[in-house]
């Protein structure tokens, strides 16, 4: 049984993970961290990770970027692997995570959905082929409570396309003013509204035809399942930086 410390247990994803974990025989939430603890979680909840005094096997983080330092500190003190699912990190924080992973076990992914990661691998294969004759745009949609924009997944997918193309690629965040699209631009557009769980639409627009590669998350359970899968995967791994490709064997 993998015992999980869930940081951000009171949020939408934390709630989804807690509920889904009840269906697992080989993983459970042993403790949670949230600034506004709820009383009906079924496990002890602490206001800060430094206060946690329950034995756990792995830290699962679905909180905010400003929690990173205390998570890394606790991980180092307790010698626990970390599964980082939070998005919106600064470049400096990403560098800190990469450096930390040289001596600690860290999993990090911008999206825990199996489907999104399959889409990402498809983009690795087709982007360089399509780029010559197709313009590329990306539209992402999320609920009105999401704080980072564009989404971490949108940036993940855009970076995959960019890295597959040999030319210099520029990102354009939204469009305004009077100017034509340059071929080496990828337009990234964010929509926020209602309770949209998550949609990412990759548009390859050519002369006379358009190709769309789209992923729609209909439930947060797809992210919760991937998160629990990552926790079980990483528990016996050595120091290094892991992602969903490792979990899925892709």
From Swiss-Prot:
The positions annotated for binding NADP(+) are 35
Q: What is its EC number?
A: 1.17.1.8
Query: What Gene3D superfamilies does this protein's entry cite?
Result: Dihydrodipicolinate Reductase, domain 2 (3.30.360.10), NAD(P)-binding Rossmann-like Domain (3.40.50.720)
Catalytic EC class: oxidoreductase
Q: Where does NAD(+) bind?
A: 8-13, 34, 85-87, 109-112
- Show the GO cellular component annotation of the record: cytosol
Kindly state which keywords UniProt assigns to this record, in alphabetical order.
Amino-acid biosynthesis, Cytoplasm, Diaminopimelate biosynthesis, Lysine biosynthesis, NAD, NADP, Oxidoreductase
Catalytic function, reaction form = (S)-2,3,4,5-tetrahydrodipicolinate + NAD(+) + H2O = (2S,4S)-4-hydroxy-2,3,4,5-tetrahydrodipicolinate + NADH + H(+); (S)-2,3,4,5-tetrahydrodipicolinate + NADP(+) + H2O = (2S,4S)-4-hydroxy-2,3,4,5-tetrahydrodipicolinate + NADPH + H(+)
Q: Which InterPro entries match?
A: DapB_C (IPR022663), DapB_N (IPR000846), DapB_N_CS (IPR022664), DHDPR_bac (IPR023940), NAD(P)-bd_dom_sf (IPR036291)
Pathway note = Amino-acid biosynthesis; L-lysine biosynthesis via DAP pathway; (S)-tetrahydrodipicolinate from L-aspartate: step 4/4
Which biological process terms from the Gene Ontology are attached to this UniProt entry?
diaminopimelate biosynthetic process; lysine biosynthetic process via diaminopimelate
What GO terms are given for molecular function? 4-hydroxy-tetrahydrodipicolinate reductase; NAD binding; NADP binding; oxidoreductase activity, acting on CH or CH2 groups, NAD or NADP as acceptor
Q: What does this protein do?
A: Catalyzes the conversion of 4-hydroxy-tetrahydrodipicolinate (HTPA) to tetrahydrodipicolinate.
Which family does the record assign?
Belongs to the DapB family.
What is the name listed in the Swiss-Prot or TrEMBL entry for this protein? 4-hydroxy-tetrahydrodipicolinate reductase
């Amino acid at each position: 049984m993998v015992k999980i410390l869930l940081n951000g247990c009171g949020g939408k994803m934390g709630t989804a993970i807690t509920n889904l974990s009840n269906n697992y025989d080989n993983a459970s939430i042993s403790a949670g961290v949230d600034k506004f603890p709820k009383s009906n979680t079924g496990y002890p909840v602490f206001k800060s990770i430094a206060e946690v005094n329950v034995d756990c096997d792995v830290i699962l983080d679905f909180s905010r970027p400003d929690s990173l330092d205390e998570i890394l500190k606790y991980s180092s003190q307790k010698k626990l692997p970390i599964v980082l699912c939070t998005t919106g990190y600064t470049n400096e924080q990403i560098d800190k995570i990469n450096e930390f992973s040289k001596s600690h076990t860290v999993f990090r992914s911008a999206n825990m959905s199996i489907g999104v990661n399959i889409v990402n691998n498809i983009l690795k294969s087709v982007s360089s082929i399509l780029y010559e004759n197709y313009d590329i745009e990306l539209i992402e949609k999320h609920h009105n409570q999401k704080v980072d924009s564009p989404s971490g997944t949108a940036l993940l997918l855009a970076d995959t396309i960019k890295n597959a193309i040999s030319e210099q690629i520029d990102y354009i965040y939204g469009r305004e003013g009077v100017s034509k699209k340059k071929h080496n631009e990828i337009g990234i557009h964010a929509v926020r509204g209602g309770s949209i769980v998550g949609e990412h639409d990759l548009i390859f627009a050519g002369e006379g035809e358009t190709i769309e590669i789209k992923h729609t998350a209909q439930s947060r359970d797809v992210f919760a399942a991937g998160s629990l899968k990552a926790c079980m995967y990483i528990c016996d791994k050595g120091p290094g930086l892991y992602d969903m490709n490792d979990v899925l064997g892709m």
